[in-house]
């Protein structure tokens, strides 16, 4: 079976949405992010068999130059027939062309098929994570004293927390490696906040689908104060919920979110990576 690979240009978008619907049922987001994907480095690849779009997959270059593998979808009738493998080969070609120092992805901790495909191309488990969410409150929220952190100050401000967060900052299930380039990029996009008087620091925002959730990637200092500010941001941005995703080892943060009404969204997740 021959699999032809080409970019998913706008004329193929409807077919790509059908592939996603077939593969993911109610967990679809491509329609919301396609225009955003066009602004990023890295290709949304389409895998065609006999002229039919059978699968899609996106490589996105993040702030630190690493490649993030996402939106890998194969239509049910084409699964386990080499389509996913072909897309992964294209991932590796792009990574070489774009000089990505790392490739990373995430999947469910119990998703044997997805993890197995990644391991065939050298990716290994890096960390296990758990995701919590809390409905946004229309009444709660207080932002007094919080200010955005300048990009040239973000890395130094956030560095002390890198170990506690096991080296990752997570938004929209995009697992950013905790480093200077990531901290600068987050700050440049208005996602790093500080309350000077209390020493509270928060990284919050959304990579995309800002109306679906405000993602809290880091919360330190007076966490109750930070959570109140997160509620305010969610209300201002029309986000339906607060989402927090962190490594299983971060028991202190897990205890805080549970005590404040957050609930686990589903099964645990894992991020996998390869150094190129």
PLM regions and their residue ranges:
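Conserved catalytic-core motifs of GNAT/GCN5-like acyltransferases
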Residues: 104-107, 124-138, 263-274
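Active-site rim helix/loop that mediates acceptor-substrate recognition in acyltransferases
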Residues: 13, 20-58, 164-194
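Conserved active-site alpha-helix within GNAT-family acetyltransferase domains
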Residues: 85, 109-127, 249-264
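A conserved beta-turn-beta hairpin within the catalytic core of GNAT-like acetyltransferases
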Residues: 61-69, 79, 203-217, 264-268
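Conserved GNAT acetyl-CoA-binding A-motif
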Residues: 95-110, 237-247
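Conserved beta-strand in the GNAT
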Residues: 46, 52-60, 68, 73, ...
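Amide-forming acyltransferase catalytic core, primarily the GNAT-like/NAT-type
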Residues: 121-210
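Conserved acetyl-CoA-binding loop-helix of GNAT-fold acetyltransferases
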Residues: 74, 80-94, 116, 120, ...
């Amino acid at each position: 079976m021959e699999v032809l690979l080409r970019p998913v240009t706008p004329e193929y978008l409807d077919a790509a949405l059908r592939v996603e619907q077939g593969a993911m049922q109610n967990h679809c987001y491509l329609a919301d992010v396609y225009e955003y994907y066009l602004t990023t480095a890295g290709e949304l690849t389409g895998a065609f068999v006999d002229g039919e779009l059978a699968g899609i997959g996106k490589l996105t270059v993040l702030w630190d130059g690493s490649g993030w593998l996402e939106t890998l979808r194969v239509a049910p009738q084409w699964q386990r027939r080499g389509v996913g493998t072909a897309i992964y080969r294209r991932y590796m070609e792009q990574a070489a062309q774009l000089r990505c120092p790392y490739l990373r992805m995430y999947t469910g901790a119990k998703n044997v098929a997805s993890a197995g495909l990644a391991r065939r191309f050298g990716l290994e488990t890096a960390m296990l994570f758990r995701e919590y969410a809390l409905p946004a409150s229309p009444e709660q929220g207080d932002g007094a004293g919080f200010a955005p952190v300048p990009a040239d100050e973000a890395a130094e401000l956030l560095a002390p927390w890198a170990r506690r967060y096991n080296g990752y900052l997570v938004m929209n299930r995009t697992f950013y490696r905790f480093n200077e380039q990531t901290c600068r990029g987050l700050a440049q996009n208005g996602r790093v906040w500080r309350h000077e008087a209390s020493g509270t620091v928060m990284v919050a925002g959304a990579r995309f689908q800002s109306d679906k959730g405000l993602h809290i990637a880091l919360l330190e200092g007076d966490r109750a104060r930070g959570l109140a500010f997160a509620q305010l941001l969610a209300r201002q941005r029309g986000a339906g919920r607060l989402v927090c995703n962190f490594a299983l080892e971060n028991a202190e943060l897990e205890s805080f979110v549970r005590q404040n009404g957050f609930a686990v969204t589903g099964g645990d997740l894992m991020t996998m990576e390869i150094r190129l």
